[in-house]
Amino acid sequence: MTNLEKMREKLQDQINYHNVLYHQKNKPEISDAEYDELKKKLAEIEPEIYATQESVGAPPDERFSKVEHQEPMLSLENAYDEQGVEKFLSKIKRFLIEDKIEILCEPKIDGLSFSAIYEDGRFVKAATRGDGFVGEDVTHNVATIKGFPKFLQGVQGRLEVRGEIYISNSDFLKLNENDEFANPRNAAAGSLKQLDANITASRPLRYFAYSLIGGAEKSQSEVLNKLEALGFCVNEHQSLTSSLDGMLKFYNEVYNCRYNLDYDIDGIVYKVNDLVLQNRLGNTHKAPRSALAYKFSAVYAKTKLNKIFIQVGRTGVLTPVADLVPVNIGGVLVSRASLHNQDEIKRKDIREGDIVTIKRAGDVIPQIVEVSRDSRLPNTPEFVFPEVCPECGSKVRQVEGEAAVRCPEEFACKAQIIEKLKHFVSKDAFDIVGLGDKQIEFFYDLGLIKQIPDIFTLEERLDEFNLEEQSGWGKKSIAHLLNAIQSRRVITLDRFIFSLGIRFIGQVAAELLADYYVSYDNWYNSMIELSSDNTELVGIDGIGKKVAESLESFFSKEHNIKMLNDLTACLQILPVSSNSSNSVLNNKIIVFTGKLLAMSRGEAKVRAKTLGAKVSSHLSAKTDYLIAGEKPGSKYKKAVELGVEILDEDQWHKVISLGVFK
């Protein structure tokens, strides 16, 4: 066995060892960054093995068959202070035009979400939340949970119960005598996701049910009562209130007694109690508008800041990052923290070698909140922010009024090009299996992939670069990669727009643009004309001036136009298909003016979009309908001049309720 083979085997053994600790025992010994470094080293030695690992996937959920949720299991919007709760309550009141809304308050259990399906009262399937749309089948494992109902008396048809699986603190202490798990949540997750249901049965899993889909209940409080009547465990701590004071009072009461509970909670969940109002509020792209999680205060820990290093992102921003001595904060090993920008470093006087206090709140990136100057060594120098890009050496720039420092060489800076390529192939964009970070860097350095279109012409240039002769690459790994690329030549418009990595164009903005323009040609042609007129783009509901300016800048550069033309010659970009094709509003451009009496402007926009309409604030000859409420503005007069059809509020209600105009 050669030294290279020995090293490869050693790295593979280390990765396998840490996979077991993380995914099965839920007791990681190293940070995510250190784990990624092991995988990168293996990739350098044997890209073929690395590509295979990337396609199969290490997470344990790949071992389970998939279950598609009929209704998405969305996450909740979070608040971390009282102002966030007040904002939530004010927003739903404005949306519904209601002065008083009943809110049900419940503890937020720190466990693992589940869905259980019953057919004619018989338990038939259980699934994890997964990505919210597709979960893992854990039917046999959930069936082993003590006291979990297998049959519901008197229930007909399909009924879905949702809740949270957890392990109590007292049971966790007994289970964790050998210190196998970091915390009760990890223990619950590891126990539920076992291939052998006998192992799950040996673990003290418990659950709370909190949601019912398919019932006849009219409120969340009725849902909880029904669940309890059916034999499900329901959390006893709950409160109904119609005021902000009542919501905050419940939070404080539970916060003060949380350590007396025998299970972990990480906040309070507020839900609009009336299910009809919940339905009217609907969902954003990621969460229901009718609920909020008020997370408990952040967890803090002290550690040493080893070094400050600079990352260059795909838009050229130089971001300082703190490399820390790894510290456990609330069961999570933290080895890096965000420093945001040079102003933040100066304001807090953060220096390398300092003892710092780290704050971690929910899913927010850990931050340095305090520096222990008493512990600082004498003559410790201030951190000097670089005046040139650490990647390409170009002089950096800072736009007046912005905190961000940028490298201006977007087409020449290696770091920016590589980060754009990584973004393009990432999971939420083209999702090309086998083209991970290390592969992108390898192909860039080799000269095979220098710009995005090169990905789809890779096969034509392989002989020129003798990839098969490169260390670790063979016919099999090359074939896998080419097949993965070939399978991604068809993509939806929103994912394509997002994949380009244009500043300010995240997934939400990309989806809004795709929904409005429907096809790539429509979008492209409209963007080309931005320099002369961007009023239509700015008028799209949810698209602001910054997005418009960013798109205008992107499409003003010949390099980007050529890249798009080269790229689209290799692809099929699917137009947006509407779920409301039978709606009279499908693909119609609608503008609102004046005050609506029966519903808020926000709700009216949501209803219009649900029916397939494109909502804009800009009225033009392209507008199909102007919805005019009380005291309409200048848009009414302009609509008359342009011959745009005008609907009053009564006509608008007939459209959204009956689908007719007259």
Curated annotation (Swiss-Prot):
Residues binding Zn(2+): C389, C392, C407, C413
CC per GO annotation: cytosol
Keyword DNA repair set for record: yes
Classification via InterPro entries: BRCT_dom (IPR001357), BRCT_dom_sf (IPR036420), DisA/LigA_HHH (IPR041663), DNA_ligase (IPR001679), DNA_ligase_AS (IPR018239), DNA_ligase_CS (IPR033136), DNAligase_adenylation (IPR013839), DNAligase_N (IPR013840)
Keywords per UniProt: DNA damage, DNA repair, DNA replication, Ligase, Magnesium, Manganese, Metal-binding, NAD, Zinc
GO terms under biological process: DNA repair; DNA replication
Gene Ontology MF annotations: DNA ligase (NAD+) activity; metal ion binding
Domain BRCT as annotated: residue spans: 580-662
PANTHER family: CHROMOSOME TRANSMISSION FIDELITY FACTOR 18 (PTHR23389), DNA LIGASE (PTHR23389:SF9)
Reactions it catalyzes: NAD(+) + (deoxyribonucleotide)n-3'-hydroxyl + 5'-phospho-(deoxyribonucleotide)m = (deoxyribonucleotide)n+m + AMP + beta-nicotinamide D-nucleotide
HAMAP family documented for this protein: DNA_ligase_A
CDD domains listed in its UniProt record: BRCT_DNA_ligase_like (cd17748), LIGANc (cd00114)
Function: DNA ligase that catalyzes the formation of phosphodiester linkages between 5'-phosphoryl and 3'-hydroxyl groups in double-stranded DNA using NAD as a coenzyme and as the energy source for the reaction. It is essential for DNA replication and repair of damaged DNA.
Residues at the catalytic site: K108 (n6-amp-lysine intermediate)
This enzyme's EC code(s): 6.5.1.2
Gene from which this protein is expressed: ligA
Annotated positions binding NAD(+): D32, A33, E34, Y35, D36, S75, L76, E106, R129, E164, K271, K295
Cofactor requirements of the protein: Mg(2+); Mn(2+)
Protein name: DNA ligase
Record flagged with keyword Magnesium: yes
